[in-house]
A protein has these predicted regions:
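Long, highly charged, low-complexity internal segments
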Residues: 1-5, 40-45, 74-190, 195
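Extended, highly charged linker/hinge segments and catalytic-adjacent loops that couple domains
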Residues: 10-84, 118, 126-163, 214-236
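Short hinge/loop at the helix->beta-strand junction immediately C-terminal to the helix-turn-helix recognition helix
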Residues: 12, 187-188, 206
Length: 236
């Protein structure tokens, strides 16, 4: 919150102690003009959001940049990161849906009754993801997630087959971010009280902040490659 306070005091973002999700007409028009100019008309989709929380107070609009044309700021690391997050989220909120193509293939084994699966996914239209993917060289990742054109009954060979043993995971421990989200969902506190509340319960010893995410568990992964089985023992 202190980083957001600095951005607000310097005039980079609007008032930050709010849980509103709505944007002003002026802000929505600024987003529309930027999106159409930089990405094209098909990337724009006007959206207006409302807060589902019963205790929400929407005297202010959502946290957003004061100038959408200002893509980045030349400040210290934490301020740059937070501004970038706010800028991208604001712009993405007024953009079209992304369109993904997902392929799931079931493969029968001629030697036994085992069924194997292969999954692939690719982006047909970036939509709002354009803001987050911009500047990332993800061509290799997209190719890795694609499947070739296949026909029913087609005979296939294999490079390798993975068999992984997994366990049902218990609920994760709270992080500061997930705890704030839970407080918001339960209607406890306000944006201006979340940070002080979390600091207070730590200072009084009610909770302890640590790096321990739980006990590591061992699992096995069996890989079949060119008729040879290899077993790896991994942890999660």
């Amino acid at each position: 919150m202190s980083v957001a306070q600095k951005l607000y005091e310097k005039g980079y973002i609007t008032y930050m102690r709010t849980d509103s999700t709505s944007l002003s007409k002026e802000a929505m028009d600024d987003c529309k003009n930027y999106i159409k100019k930089e990405y094209g008309n098909k990337f724009y989709k006007e959206r207006q959001y409302s807060n589902k929380s019963k205790n929400a107070q929407e005297a202010h609009e959502a946290i957003r940049p004061t100038n959408m044309k200002l893509h980045s700021i030349d400040k210290e690391y934490d301020q740059n990161r937070l501004y970038d997050l706010i800028w991208k989220r604001t712009l993405a909120s007024q953009m079209s849906d992304a369109q993904l193509e997902r392929t799931n293939v079931k493969i029968e084994n001629s030697n036994n009754d085992k069924i194997f699966t292969a999954n692939g996914e690719m982006i047909n239209f970036d939509g709002f993801l354009k803001v987050y993917l911009e500047g990332n060289d993800n061509e290799d990742e997209e190719k890795a997630g694609m499947l070739p054109n296949l026909k029913i009954g087609e005979h296939l060979g294999y490079n390798f087959i993975n068999a992984t043993q997994r366990f049902t995971s218990p609920p994760y421990r709270f992080t500061e971010a997930s705890l704030v989200k839970q407080l918001e969902e339960l209607g406890i506190g306000r944006p201006s009280t979340y940070a002080p509340t979390i600091s207070t319960v730590q200072r009084r010893g009610y909770v302890e902040k640590g790096q321990n995410e739980g006990l590591e568990r061992i699992y096995e992964q069996i890989i079949l490659t060119k008729g040879s089985l290899n077993t790896q023992t991994l942890t999660e």
